[in-house]
């Protein structure tokens, strides 16, 4: 790729700045960390690695980056693509081979979506590998749109007000997951991926599945954004500005103990002079 145009340079700077802000706001990466960057071969993880490699050079702290890809033995998976790309970059990497594809195909009935089981199997394998190599953080390529989509998926289909946090301690307590692209839009990431011409690897297992719940939510958000630009960003900001006393979760706020504060200064409204 040659010299960047003005708009391309702005795009690159914006992604780097937003990732840096997210990392700082949530203390995602600390001095001495060994960050395991999970690469799927998609636009998001390529962009994440690219941005983290830049931040590694300019950050005031020192941290190591190890790229990890999980070969799930999907038919037609181009095994040579990621090793060739990472060797050219000079990045330390590992390819973890585990045939989760066969497990998913065996357990999931024909016509049903494979995403949930596939992601659980992949996540468990990566958690174990992160522990084996001594990684202190595990970086995933989810972006702002993914986080908002997950929020609506949980609300619509699971009856839960939860999303996909920028930083998470895994249930096993031994892994900390970070999402450096949490502030970045999918639109910017797609444009950056196209600009950089990353060697994208399609997912033959789930990429061809239609009518997924997530796709329905994604289409809804795209339509909202088309009619009301900035709505996705506003929803994401709402996730950062939660008021438990204005919701209905009794575990987050003690509604049962609410009483009049006798010491509070009375507020009188002069209704005659409104």
UniProtKB/Swiss-Prot annotation:
Signal among keywords: no
Annotated localization: Cytoplasm
Short motif PP-loop motif, span: 40-45
Pathway entry: tRNA modification
Binding-site residues for [4Fe-4S] cluster, renumbered to this chain: 115, 118, 206
Coiled-coil region list: none
GO molecular function, one term: ATP binding
Catalyzed reactions: cytidine(32) in tRNA + S-sulfanyl-L-cysteinyl-[cysteine desulfurase] + AH2 + ATP = 2-thiocytidine(32) in tRNA + L-cysteinyl-[cysteine desulfurase] + A + AMP + diphosphate + H(+)
Xref: PANTHER family: AMINOTRAN_5 DOMAIN-CONTAINING PROTEIN (PTHR43686:SF1), SULFURTRANSFERASE-RELATED (PTHR43686)
Name of protein: tRNA-cytidine(32) 2-sulfurtransferase
Gene: ttcA
